[in-house]
Design a protein with these regions (language model features):
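Extended, positively charged loop/linker patches that create polyanion-binding surfaces
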Residues: 200
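Catalytic-core regions of glycoside hydrolase
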Residues: 1-197, 206, 223-240, 285-294
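Long, charge-rich alpha-helical interaction segments
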Residues: 209, 213-222
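Histidine-centered catalytic/metal-binding microenvironments
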Residues: 227-296
């Protein structure tokens, strides 16, 4: 086709996401099967080697409507091995576990980890790693790879570094892996840096990713502090101790370690700002102008 000539397409993969956060006009199994069948036929007519790449966010987002019989009808209407599925949000829900491994269709296990490019210390990293290891063992021969589906780049690197390395290093002891990461980041063996990273791994990076951030990143408003989007499951005092341990390192010459210092420090200060803002709101509501003036 003219489009193929212009773009010189060689991979034969076509990303198509019908019903993504959109209701189907008809929820009958026959209608859903007809939709997926016609989608595949349309790309096959243009490219006989076409493969359809489909994210499965809709099965999670509209899980009450996307029942197992409906999912099965939608998937099985496409010829075998012509529909590749992205198990989109495995850090929260693994769809393969509830669909008989996507009824035999090839799929990719994906770690989302970030919504909207928000920069915050979040991600149930250890739990997600265990889920991935289980998938690699029990996910079936149609599990074809590991991927990430983050909604923004230049976000927290650590979760992706840990998760994606499991493609090469399955069943590596987590404690040893974290120590190696700490040594690599700082450029030497530093017990304080190792301790800091173990606390980050075991106690800080434990929250299932959602649209989280720190208050300075949100539009300012009195008595509105985006509590649902700034809440943490750890104590900021604990994170401050992690930052202190990182600052005990003998060297900060490596960029990776400087990024660690910035990442943790930014989160500590961002979390603390929430406390300051709540106190500010209290003073304004009470018209305590002397207290406000005293705080500068």
């Amino acid at each position: 086709s003219a489009a193929s000539d212009v773009y010189k397409r060689q991979d034969h993969i076509y990303g198509i996401d019908p019903f993504n956060e959109v209701d189907s006009p008809d929820w009958s199994e026959d209608f859903l099967a007809n939709v997926s069948s016609k989608i595949y036929e349309s790309i096959h007519q243009v490219d006989s080697a076409a493969q359809w790449l489909q994210m499965t966010w809709m099965f999670f987002y509209d899980k009450k409507k996307w029942t197992q019989p409906r999912i099965r009808s939608f998937l099985k209407a496409v010829p075998d091995n012509k529909l590749i599925l992205l198990d989109y949000y495995c850090d929260h829900t693994e769809i393969w576990r509830n669909t008989e491994k996507y009824y035999g269709n090839p799929y990719i296990w994906c770690y989302l980890g970030n919504f909207g490019g928000n920069t915050t210390l979040t991600g149930n990293v250890k739990e997600s790693g265990a889920r991935l290891e289980n998938a690699l063992i029990n996910g079936g021969g149609n599990l074809k790879g590991i991927g990430s589906t983050l909604e923004g780049l230049d976000v927290m690197q650590f979760p992706y570094e840990y998760i994606l390395e499991k493609a090469w290093n399955l069943n590596v002891d987590d404690n040893k892996w974290i120590e190696c990461l700490a040594d690599r980041h700082v450029g030497c063996v530093s017990q304080s840096v190792r301790d800091a990273w173990k606390r980050l791994f075991n106690d800080i990076y434990v929250q299932v990713p959602r649209t989280l951030g720190t208050l300075p990143g949100y539009r300012p408003a009195l008595n509105k502090n985006s509590e649902k989007r700034t809440s943490n499951v750890y104590s900021n005092v604990e994170l401050l101790e992690v930052w202190r341990k990182l600052n005990e390192a003998p060297s900060d010459r490596r960029d990776a370690f400087r990024l660690d210092l910035i990442t943790v420090g930014r989160q500590v200060l961002g979390n603390y700002f929430l406390d300051v803002k709540m106190e500010f709101d209290r003073m304004v509501e009470a018209k305590d102008y002397q207290a406000l003036k005293a705080c500068g």
